[in-house]
Amino acid sequence: MKNELKKARTQKHKKIIASIPYTLLFAYMAIFVLGCETSQTSSGNLDTTNITPTQSQALQIIQNALVDEDSLARVNAVEVIVTTGQIKFMPQVQRLLRDKFTPVRFAAALAIGDLRYSPAKSSLSQSLKDEDINVIVAAAYAMGRLGSTKYFEIVRKAIDNDDQTVRANAAFILGRMEDRNSLKLLKWAQEDKDSSDKVRLQALEARARLGDDEVLPRLWAIVYSAYADDRIMGIRAIGALATSKARDILITKLDDDILEVRLAAAEQLGKLGNRTGEMEVLEAVEKNLTTGLDREASERANVLAALAIGEICTPELTKFLPNLLKNESKFVRIAAAKAVLQCKMK
């Protein structure tokens, strides 16, 4: 009976791996990304003359990922650069505006906007003519962040695009523009009968990011979905809301049956400055709870554990990062590198 229950749980959460890495957005679709977080540029750019061997290894992992043959690894690397404010890598990110893969170009444009990397402004003007509208929307966002605010209108208009990926990406970007006037557009996208589920969920998360408390009941329902992948996506959106009620809901998910859900909740709590999930993460890495999982599930859990460590950053957890930096999976290594750089910033 116990083995059957374990098997059932594995089957029920098996589609998580498909929904997180190849999810709603054209970019930031890494296993650990559903939209990258606001960077802390002022403190994130490490002084390479005074770093530990572990930090040096983390930087090398990101450097390698930027030129990895796997486009998803390149997207992951860009997300880490933004989140940790590694400006020194931005010339390489700028070159990715010419990458042959659309998600990479999209991620590069977003990164330039997020970090307000003005040396890339002339390159962005070319991205505004990209063959893919998703890249054009991302470039418009970046141009707006660099002072040419008229381009934000391109993002606003994209929310009404018939292409559901374009619409979802527009919702994602609207949530990053820090303009509460976008709430009306996001609510429309969420409620429009032609919007797909991915658009509705992205609109909900964007509304949460903009501090719209009205989304809480809807997100609550998603967090308690029967499907683990839905719960994880709901947890990310709840974390973006960043209220005391959101925190309380996240704490309840530390008791979830599925390891990945518990780790995702611990990560979001860490972002809110709450270390309640530390023991869940510690148990996962100390007791090696990924043992017995298939390779895909193990990779997923290790990525989520590394991300949670990067938000909580206690010595009891960070001591596991050196081993995670040596994991056979490049995605686990990138997530661990992100955690190392994040903890250096705190």
Model-found features: residue ranges?
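Amphipathic alpha-helical scaffolding segments comprising HEAT/armadillo-like alpha-solenoid repeats
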Residues: 38, 52-65, 86-98, 117-129, ...
